[in-house]
């Protein structure tokens, strides 16, 4: 009986996670292939300027994430985590197909970047809803005492989505010449992402719903998923903001911007940088469940404190050393130091946020303040870095990242140990964590 329940939990975690992988693959393909398609959507000119325009549109996608988290979070808290996750993957697939099919600037002029913006708005809407709902679902479905471990798979699949994007990039780099990549090869990964969503739609329709949501649905609470209900938890909302600020800036700096930094500032070949990123992210993925399991043993707060202290002290030195190196192995090792530090945040941030809120507003509570913070700070990190580089002050960005982490450290220092005050455990009272809710 216990084994059957464990298998059921693992199956639902897998179904929720693999959809998360496709969502983030579609999101990251844009960044991974920006160095190839940036010239397709903007007038010919300086490569840094084209990348700056592409990064600005990347940031625009982040601006839709709070709206997505508001709409999808409310939907998930009222109609179920499964229904919201199914809807989010459908919207993401649509955005990817639009990008894949959009003609170049030379063909349709200003309409090319306009359509690109619209597609990124759709993807931002989707991802905004995906994060909070996915974090909530994985946290609720996990077994008591293993929630840190199971919820860490949100970032396992999040980063795995980026790895798949990089893997596709590496394969295409081997098969196609650079002119072909810039002309049409960059469209292939967007088509792959849209096709992968079809399988995910089927998987997500067969997921079980959590017991927590089933209880809320049976009680028909009108306050479920409302801003009014969320505002009754101001401390939890502010904790999510403080928890996220430094973590999201550090995460996007090391996993998204660093690829461009190695090419444009360090001067390493694109193909070498792709391999460095792929191997580093593979190790990063393995670290997530290890750190998540550790948090089940020693608590969430020690990992966050380690990230806050080390991130504040070592971020600037890592970048100063990297910009002076010419050796790929040194660049790889420096990237790994950064990713190991960031693991203190990424591995457990989903469960920490989920443990702060009651079921009736958990998806909205996890998603909305997170999405607002990411839109303001995470989504603009790459743009700020490229802008500072364009005016010859790139090193200021290193201290900006360190400063953001320092602000979050104050939150980690002042917050309670969430595993000991978990709303999830308090509501469950030792009950099962899933129900077969396929008829709903």
What does each model-found stretch correspond to?
Residues 34-65:
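Extracellular/periplasmic helix-loop-helix junction of adjacent transmembrane segments
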Residues 31, 234-283, 377-382:
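Extracytoplasmic gate region of multi-pass secondary transporters
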Residues 90-109, 309-325:
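C-terminal ends and interior cores of transmembrane alpha-helices
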């Amino acid at each position: 009986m216990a084994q059957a329940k464990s298998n059921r939990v693992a199956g639902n975690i897998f179904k929720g996670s693999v959809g998360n992988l496709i969502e983030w693959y579609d999101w990251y393909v844009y960044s991974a292939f920006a160095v190839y398609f940036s010239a397709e959507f903007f007038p010919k000119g300086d490569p840094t300027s084209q990348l700056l325009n592409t990064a600005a549109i990347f940031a625009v996608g982040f601006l839709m994430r709070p709206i997505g988290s508001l709409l999808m979070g409310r939907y998930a808290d009222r109609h179920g985590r499964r229904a919201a996750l199914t809807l989010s993957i459908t919207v993401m697939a649509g955005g990817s197909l639009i990008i894949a099919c959009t003609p170049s600037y030379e063909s349709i002029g200003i309409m090319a970047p306009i359509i690109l913006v619209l597609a990124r708005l759709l993807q931002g809407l989707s991802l905004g809803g995906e994060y909070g709902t996915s974090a909530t679902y994985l946290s609720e479905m996990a077994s008591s005492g293993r929630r840190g471990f199971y919820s860490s798979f949100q970032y396992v699949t999040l980063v795995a989505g980026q790895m798949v994007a990089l893997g596709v990039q590496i394969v295409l780099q081997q098969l196609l010449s650079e002119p072909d990549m810039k002309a049409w090869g960059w469209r292939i990964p967007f088509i792959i992402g849209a096709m992968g969503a079809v399988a995910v739609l089927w998987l997500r329709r067969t997921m079980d719903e959590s017991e927590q949501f089933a209880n809320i649905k049976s009680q028909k609470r009108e306050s479920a998923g409302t801003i009014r209900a969320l505002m009754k938890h101001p401390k939890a909302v502010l904790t999510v903001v403080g928890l996220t600020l430094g973590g999201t800036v550090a995460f996007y700096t090391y996993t998204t911007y660093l690829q461009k930094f190695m090419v444009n500032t360090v001067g390493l070949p694109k193909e070498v940088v792709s391999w460095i990123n792929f191997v580093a992210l593979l190790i990063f993925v393995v670290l997530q469940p290890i750190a998540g399991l550790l948090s089940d043993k020693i608590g969430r707060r020690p990992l966050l404190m380690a990230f806050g202290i080390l991130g504040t002290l070592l971020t600037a030195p890592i970048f100063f050393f990297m910009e002076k190196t010419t050796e790929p192995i040194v660049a790889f090792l420096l990237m790994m130091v950064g990713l190991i530090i960031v693991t203190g945040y990424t591995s457990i941030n989903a469960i920490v946020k989920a443990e702060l809120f009651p079921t009736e507003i958990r998806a909205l509570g996890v998603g909305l303040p997170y999405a607002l913070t990411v839109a303001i700070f995470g989504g603009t990190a790459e743009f700020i870095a490229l802008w500072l580089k364009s005016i010859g002050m790139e090193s200021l960005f290193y201290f900006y990242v360190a400063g953001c982490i320092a602000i979050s450290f104050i939150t980690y220092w002042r917050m309670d140990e969430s595993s000991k005050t978990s709303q999830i455990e308090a509501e469950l009272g030792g009950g099962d964590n899933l129900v077969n809710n396929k008829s709903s």
